[in-house]
């Protein structure tokens, strides 16, 4: 439902999201520190499995690839190939299909995880756990792994298990209402881009790098959970430029 920001702040899910940090790391296993690899680019030698699709997660993988990481995009053959999205966010990545509903597919992914530094995950909460690739499983397969997951509504609260995407979160969290107010006519308006997706994508890349550095310093296996709704709250906290609605000449 369309809400203003005050209504979202009073909603149980809005309150649950407000109680979360933007980046919520959790140590999920023990492992010795693993030294960073040297190379010509900042992330040279970093191996990333990108199990995400559409915008938010793939933007994170693209940012890591742009700084030298070796990123493999893992796609399900059962899901549609979205041409524009892959052209935009697949740059610099390898791509492969892997059907995790089959034993062969699960064995293939397990072998890839065993050689990875980072796994990006945008599956619905608990979906990968049911397939044998939850955070604890990843830490067992690859001690020292960094797991970065994202969802729409956050990791706690009554909507934690719901599916969602940028436009729904914009509407529920008051962004469309605020855009209408800024336009002066009060009619709900979407942001001019999928800002929550793109913003969260860059937070994905930041979190992955931060936790890989932490692993190199103190060891351990790590999981970080992010959400579009928490990114929305962070973007709100940055404030707005009054009178800046429309094109700037």
Predicted feature locations:
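Short, well-ordered alpha-helix to beta-strand connector turns
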Residues: 68, 92-93, 116, 165
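Short, hinge-like loop/turn segments at secondary-structure boundaries
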Residues: 18-20, 89-92, 163-169
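Rossmann-like NAD(P)-binding element
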Residues: 93-128
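The feature captures the short pre-catalytic strand/loop hairpin that immediately precedes
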Residues: 175-192
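Glycine-rich phosphate-binding loop and adjoining beta1-alpha1-beta2 segment
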Residues: 69, 73-99, 104
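Acyl-CoA thioester-binding alpha/beta core of soluble enzymes
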Residues: 1-78, 106, 110, 114-118, ...
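N-terminal Rossmann-like NAD(P) cofactor-binding subdomain of oxidoreductases
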Residues: 102, 121-174
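Hydrophobic alpha-helical scaffolding
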Residues: 99, 118, 158, 162-165, ...
């Amino acid at each position: 439902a369309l809400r203003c920001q005050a209504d979202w702040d009073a909603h149980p899910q809005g309150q649950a999201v407000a109680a979360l940090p933007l980046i919520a790391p959790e140590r999920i296993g023990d492992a010795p520190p693993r030294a960073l690899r040297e190379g010509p680019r900042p992330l040279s030698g970093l191996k990333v499995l990108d199990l995400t699709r559409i915008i938010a997660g793939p933007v994170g993988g693209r940012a890591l690839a742009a700084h030298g990481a070796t990123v493999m995009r893992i796609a399900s053959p059962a899901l549609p190939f979205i041409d524009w999205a892959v052209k935009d966010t697949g740059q610099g990545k390898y791509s492969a299909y892997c059907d995790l509903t089959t034993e062969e597919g699960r064995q293939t992914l397990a072998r890839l995880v065993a050689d990875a530094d980072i796994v990006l995950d945008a599956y619905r909460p608990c979906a990968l756990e049911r397939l044998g690739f939850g955070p604890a499983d990843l830490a067992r397969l690859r001690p020292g792994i960094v797991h970065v997951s994202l969802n729409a509504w956050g990791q706690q609260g009554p909507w934690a298990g719901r599916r969602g995407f940028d436009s729904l979160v914009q509407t529920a969290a008051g962004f469309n209402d605020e855009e209408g107010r800024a336009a002066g006519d009060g009619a709900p308006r979407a942001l001019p881009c999928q800002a929550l997706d793109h913003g969260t994508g860059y937070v994905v890349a930041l979190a992955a790098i931060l936790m890989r550095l932490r692993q190199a310093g103190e060891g351990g296996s790590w999981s970080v959970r992010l959400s579009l709704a928490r990114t929305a709250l962070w973007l709100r906290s940055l404030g707005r430029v009054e009178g800046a609605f429309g094109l700037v000449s």
